[in-house]
């Protein structure tokens, strides 16, 4: 059996009310924005999907601080104006908390496109990597990742098909 690693832990502020997203296998899912602070102090607004039963267990209001654990998921949204990859966090647990912001992700996947090494306008070395992270039932999430500095240099040399672990 294949070892599957796709885990994310986020602490952030609820930035909007959950709204109905979709139903899958009889489960209703709701989407909401979570404002997550980086180490630099910059705030990112991340889309989170949560099943209705999880939201019912954790009643939260706008501005509340939530600790969310789950997986990073992706799907191709086929709109009339074109396709685009939609990335979100699928919440598995969610609690109200007052802890310091603790944000971590762990992925194990396969490089599915040739890495692209480049320098930013500010001179930083980065490498764009598309990682295919397996999940059960022969499915995969395709996650674009940006690697920095020495890690970017090393990843630029990796061929398609290489298994890569990121934390």
Language-model segments: residues:
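Single-stranded nucleic acid-binding surfaces, predominantly the OB-fold ssDNA-binding core
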Residues: 1-167
């Amino acid at each position: 059996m294949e070892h599957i690693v796709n885990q994310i832990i986020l602490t952030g502020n609820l930035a909007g009310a959950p709204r109905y997203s979709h139903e899958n296998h009889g489960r209703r899912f709701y989407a909401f924005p979570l404002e997550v602070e980086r180490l630099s102090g910059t705030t990112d607004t991340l889309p989170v999907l949560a099943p209705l039963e999880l939201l019912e267990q954790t009643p939260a209001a706008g501005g509340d601080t939530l600790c969310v654990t789950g997986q990073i998921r992706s799907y191709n949204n086929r709109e009339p104006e074109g396709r685009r990859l939609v990335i979100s966090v699928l919440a598995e647990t969610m609690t109200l908390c007052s802890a310091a912001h603790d944000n971590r992700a762990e992925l194990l996947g396969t490089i599915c496109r040739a890495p692209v090494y480049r320098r930013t306008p500010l001179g930083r070395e980065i490498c764009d990597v598309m990682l295919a992270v397996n999940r059960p039932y022969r499915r995969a999430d395709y996650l674009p990742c940006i690697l920095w500095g020495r890690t970017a240099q090393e990843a630029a040399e990796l061929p398609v098909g290489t298994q890569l672990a990121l934390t």
